[in-house]
């Protein structure tokens, strides 16, 4: 994510392996981790440093330790992660994005975010390849909740600026025979508890050297 008007969630967690249905755990804002889930962020600086690092693509211009801040939740109790790094000021994407230190194949991901100003823009990258858009005010295929540039924005499910939102993403990675892709990546997603993408094939890679998660 970039220096935008976005707070990342109090709790980010992930189930690795087969992508189970939503019936196997809670979904939506304030969901609790399902049994066996790996918590990726719990509101603490310790976990931020333990499990996250900068994505060192060609535009990277920051340096460790991670400059993103732990701040008080602007809505509820607790602490959250603010997506701010001075080098990314002015929307210079790719200069200070974060990625998990671990790599994952098939998984179910829960992430909560809060946009504090109109037009806030970021994104959730899956495997540094595929982007689920986070963009206030945009209802197009490049807009909020879209598999970017491939599906319409499910903007109807968005809670709006100043409120917490949640993506629950079931992701099945692409399959390959050698260098040839044999099966496309597939995503099913719930946005604030509403099912908005169902077994959606992902055709294009939007991540890579210029982008992070």
What are these regions (language model features)?
Residues 8-17:
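Bacterial N-terminal signal peptides
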């Amino acid at each position: 994510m970039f220096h935008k008007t976005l707070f990342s969630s109090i709790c980010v967690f992930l189930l690795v392996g087969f992508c189970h249905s939503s019936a196997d755990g809670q979904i939506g804002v304030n969901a609790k981790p399902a049994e066996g889930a790996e918590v990726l962020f719990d509101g603490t600086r310790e976990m931020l440093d333990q499990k996250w690092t900068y994505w060192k693509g060609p535009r990277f211009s920051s340096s460790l330790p991670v400059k993103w801040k732990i701040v008080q939740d602007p809505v509820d109790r607790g602490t959250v992660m603010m997506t701010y790094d001075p080098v990314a000021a002015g929307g210079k994407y790719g200069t200070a994005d974060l990625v998990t230190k671990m790599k994952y194949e098939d998984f179910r991901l829960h992430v909560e975010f809060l946009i504090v100003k109109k037009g806030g823009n970021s994104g959730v990258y899956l495997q540094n390849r595929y982007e689920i858009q986070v963009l206030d005010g945009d209802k197009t295929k490049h807009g909020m909740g879209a598999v970017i540039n491939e599906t319409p924005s499910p903007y109807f499910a968005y809670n709006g600026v100043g409120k917490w939102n949640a993506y629950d993403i079931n992701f099945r990675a692409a399959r390959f025979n050698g260098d040839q892709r044999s099966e496309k990546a597939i995503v099913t997603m719930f946005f604030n508890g509403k099912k908005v993408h169902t077994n959606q094939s992902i055709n294009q890679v939007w991540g890579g050297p210029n982008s992070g998660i």
